[in-house]
Amino acid sequence: MYALQAKQERNGFKMKKVLIFYASYGGGHLSAANAINDYIKNNYEDVETEIIDCMKYVNKHLEKVTTTAYKEMAKKAPWAWGTIYYTSQKGPVAELTSTSNKILARKLNILLQEYMPDLIISTHPFASQMCSFLKKHNKINCKIASIMTDFAPHDQWLVGKKCIDYFFVAHNKMKEDLIAKKVPAEKIFVTGIPLSNKFLLNFDRSDILNQFGLKENKKTILFFGGGEFGLGKSKTLKVLSSLLNDFNNIQIVAISGKNIKMKHKFEELAHNSNMPEDIKIMEYTNKVPELMSVSDLV
């Protein structure tokens, strides 16, 4: 169960309450939610926050089935996920999704009535849809903010748009696209996608290079190749192989994440390459901000 027992009073005044929803279809939605949560906690003493996986809360079994399917398609058949992504803009798939979220919203309403937030922040369109449906039917009356964790405005974000108070988008073109889709300009804010404060820190370049055994006189490439999306396994390996064999005076930090099979493939490529001593292979790491600070290309 999520910890929902919050202090109602602190230092004589009532705490504002913010619910931050995400969904586990890729790590970006949670990363954005965590970044927002950290910022609020560090800057607003009178605001209490809670982060919740909306799909896991409303139906754990459905969440497990759909996230597993998502990950498998992303790894083994990214074209299939691409098809779903585009067909869910409009038509039967879009209707099925929005109808399902309306049904699931009833369970989410239990949480909202218990917590009584002053503001709902959503980093996934499913949560935005559920909350906007509840607001439309007068089950909730708090403000709703959609943090669009995409670089293009998928129509799933716009279901129930009349009941969503704020849209935070990655760039100006997205704002223009939303205006073209009848979202009022005063609701749209160009902020970029939320990032951890760690990415704003200034690191000592020499210290970081030494920490990871990197050379000062070589260009550094930070290569991500183990995630759920991207080029797919064969193209990822082809790109890394080209970097290893066709370029001079570079060093590579190749991050395979939690994908152990990809890590082994990286190691095999490195062993057979022209520069095995100039590639560092890493699994999941929380040192990405530091590595990015010394990288010439990501």
Task: Please describe what each predicted stretch is.
Residues 15-18:
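Extreme N-terminal starter segment of soluble prokaryotic enzymes
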Residues 23-32, 231:
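A short, glycine/small-residue-rich beta-strand->loop->alpha-helix junction that serves as a flexible
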Residues 35-111:
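Conserved N-terminal ligand/cofactor-binding loop architecture of enzyme catalytic domains
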Residues 83-181, 187-190:
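Active-site and donor-binding regions of nucleotide-sugar-utilizing enzymes
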Residues 165-228, 260-261:
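A nucleotide-sugar donor-handling region in carbohydrate enzymes
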Residues 215-294:
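Donor-nucleotide binding loops and adjacent catalytic segments primarily
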Residues 297-298:
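Hydrophobic acceptor-binding patch used for acceptor engagement in glycosyltransferases
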